Amino acid sequence: MNTEIAIIGGGASGLAAAIEVRRLLPQAELLVIERLDRVGKKILATGNGRCNLSNENISARNYHGSFMGAAEIIEHTPTAAAYFKNLGLLTAADSAGRIYPYSNAAASVLTALRLRAEELGVKMLCGAFVTDIRHSADGYCIDCENGEKITAKRVIIATGGCAAPQFGTDGAYQFQIIHNIYNKTHKA
């Protein structure tokens, strides 16, 4: 299977990446590769099933890290509420400023992301556990545990973090794959 851009990981960040890539590159052929049987499974468990999207109190003045550009990024990033409103999902804040979907159901967030990606023609390959990525003359060769072989000019890795491995993400996966790509494409 060939694609222009492969996005490894079909969670919230993988689906959002697909939507944003389509916005920036409307003609690009996109493929989301998800190791589980469906995209967005972990979204359903976030925020105790309500999916806490953001917080009204996010501000550069609350950032205390060492990255000096963070304030600029925070101040000029669209809010989660605006992003999801653009996807057709209404949000509401609770008394502590936490932003949830108006429905108070994480399934609404998954539906908004998945439907927008589908509306935009993003292809999704589920049940495909990526075992290797190799750099090639034309981009990348991606091998899956099920025998599927995918070639892509570009790859976005959005495989999730370490939290809640019972939902199919263990975090170690992304580091192993990135380490393999880096070691194969860069000389020490």
Question: Can you name each region flagged by the protein language model?
Answer:
Residues I19, R23, L115:
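Short, well-ordered alpha-helices that flank and scaffold nucleotide-derived cofactor binding pockets
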Residues G47-A96:
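Glycine-rich active-site loop/strand segments that organize a redox cofactor
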Residues M68-P78, S95-L115, L125, C162-T169:
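Short beta-strand to alpha-helix junction loop
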Residues F84, L113, I177:
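Residue-level signal for inorganic ion chemistry
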Residues A107-S108, R116-A188:
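Predominantly flavin-linked oxidoreductase catalytic cores and closely associated redox partners
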